[in-house]
Amino acid sequence: MECPNCHKNASRVIDSRPSDENRAIRRRRECENCGFRFTTFERVERSPLLVIKNDGTREAFNRDKILHGVMMAAQKRPISSEQLDTLVDHVENEIRKQGLNEISSKDIGNLVMKELANLDDVAYIRFASIYRQFKDVSGFMEAMEDMMAKHDKE
């Protein structure tokens, strides 16, 4: 595997262990050229999944887009990157469980919001404000009321 430091193709595995609830293998590698250590992950290749965007176009599912969105929503919140990665895993697993080849971006957004609501209220509201494209304060207030109603039920 290519070293991210010196770009030589000479590395060796120095540690290997299950990761992501046994859905991946985490490998710690060391470059034989420069000694730089880095981590790689091995995951099962899954069948392609297409996302139907709001304008009707389709694109390949990209978990990194979801991760980026939740990272932005969780900025300066007490949420670890591991928690965000787990959230994205839950969303992706939920999508895959449905056995579909295509899913709308709206459905993905709803799954993300459901997961965020269980993780952090502020991150949920931040994500909702972009995902739902609030036009004014009333849309924001509706999201806040939804969150408060959820807490009242608990």
UniProtKB/Swiss-Prot annotation:
<protein>
    <recommendedName>
        <fullName>Transcriptional repressor NrdR</fullName>
    </recommendedName>
</protein>
<feature type="domain" description="ATP-cone">
    <location>
        <begin position="49"/>
        <end position="139"/>
    </location>
</feature>
<comment type="function">
    <text>Negatively regulates transcription of bacterial ribonucleotide reductase nrd genes and operons by binding to NrdR-boxes.</text>
</comment>
<keyword id="KW-0238">DNA-binding</keyword>
<keyword id="KW-0479">Metal-binding</keyword>
<dbReference type="InterPro" id="IPR055173">
    <property type="entry name" value="NrdR-like_N"/>
</dbReference>
<dbReference type="InterPro" id="IPR005144">
    <property type="entry name" value="ATP-cone_dom"/>
</dbReference>
<feature type="zinc finger region">
    <location>
        <begin position="3"/>
        <end position="34"/>
    </location>
</feature>
<keyword id="KW-0805">Transcription regulation</keyword>
<dbReference type="GO" id="GO:0003677">
    <property type="term" value="F:DNA binding"/>
</dbReference>
<comment type="similarity">
    <text>Belongs to the NrdR family.</text>
</comment>
<dbReference type="GO" id="GO:0008270">
    <property type="term" value="F:zinc ion binding"/>
</dbReference>
<keyword id="KW-0804">Transcription</keyword>
<feature type="region of interest" description="Disordered">
    <location>
        <begin position="1"/>
        <end position="22"/>
    </location>
</feature>
<keyword id="KW-0862">Zinc</keyword>
<dbReference type="Pfam" id="PF03477">
    <property type="entry name" value="ATP-cone"/>
</dbReference>
<dbReference type="GO" id="GO:0005524">
    <property type="term" value="F:ATP binding"/>
</dbReference>
<dbReference type="Pfam" id="PF22811">
    <property type="entry name" value="Zn_ribbon_NrdR"/>
</dbReference>
<keyword id="KW-0547">Nucleotide-binding</keyword>
<dbReference type="InterPro" id="IPR003796">
    <property type="entry name" value="RNR_NrdR-like"/>
</dbReference>
<dbReference type="GO" id="GO:0045892">
    <property type="term" value="P:negative regulation of DNA-templated transcription"/>
</dbReference>
<keyword id="KW-0863">Zinc-finger</keyword>
<keyword id="KW-0067">ATP-binding</keyword>
<keyword id="KW-0678">Repressor</keyword>
